[in-house]
Amino acid sequence: MPELLKQRVETCYQQAETFFKRPFPRPEVSFKLRGQKAGVAHLHENLLRFNLQLYRENQEDFLRQTVAHEVAHLVAHQLFGDRIQAHGEEWQLIMRGVYELPPNRCHNYEVQRRVATRYIYRCPCPQGEFAFTAQRHKLVRQGRRYLCKRCRETLVYSGETRVE
């Protein structure tokens, strides 16, 4: 686990403890997050998940803003309970008052779109070409059948793929 991120989580907790004059339990930290989200706070599990790729590509802002953003969710939940809005006034108070950061809801990191392979299936219809995802293609290989809505014939794998 990146040590700087771990240290930043700890620093955020120390700032919150100084500000609120009370201790907070430390969360488990995971890097099992992919896609567009930079971070997620699981309130009831006391768990923070971070996107390692976005961290590596945006380290400075990620450490300053994203880590504080997610820690603020856990601190707000531990202080105010379940009945608060995710980015409501309690969370904003923590972002502004404790961390002296703008309470931004979303990041503006550039997210690389994943390359996806499509498997081409056909039927006898004109323009009867269908691009299946890897998951749907696997289901066909396991015996599932898909029918064309126009001609009601079974779609057949053409042996072709394309990358999108």
Swiss-Prot record:
<keyword id="KW-0963">Cytoplasm</keyword>
<dbReference type="GO" id="GO:0005737">
    <property type="term" value="C:cytoplasm"/>
</dbReference>
<keyword id="KW-0479">Metal-binding</keyword>
<feature type="binding site">
    <location>
        <position position="73"/>
    </location>
    <ligand>
        <name>Zn(2+)</name>
    </ligand>
</feature>
<dbReference type="Pfam" id="PF10263">
    <property type="entry name" value="SprT-like"/>
</dbReference>
<comment type="similarity">
    <text>Belongs to the SprT family.</text>
</comment>
<dbReference type="GO" id="GO:0006950">
    <property type="term" value="P:response to stress"/>
</dbReference>
<feature type="active site">
    <location>
        <position position="70"/>
    </location>
</feature>
<keyword id="KW-0862">Zinc</keyword>
<feature type="binding site">
    <location>
        <position position="69"/>
    </location>
    <ligand>
        <name>Zn(2+)</name>
    </ligand>
</feature>
<dbReference type="InterPro" id="IPR006640">
    <property type="entry name" value="SprT-like_domain"/>
</dbReference>
<dbReference type="GO" id="GO:0008270">
    <property type="term" value="F:zinc ion binding"/>
</dbReference>
<feature type="domain" description="SprT-like">
    <location>
        <begin position="14"/>
        <end position="156"/>
    </location>
</feature>
<protein>
    <recommendedName>
        <fullName>Protein SprT</fullName>
    </recommendedName>
</protein>
<dbReference type="InterPro" id="IPR023483">
    <property type="entry name" value="Uncharacterised_SprT"/>
</dbReference>
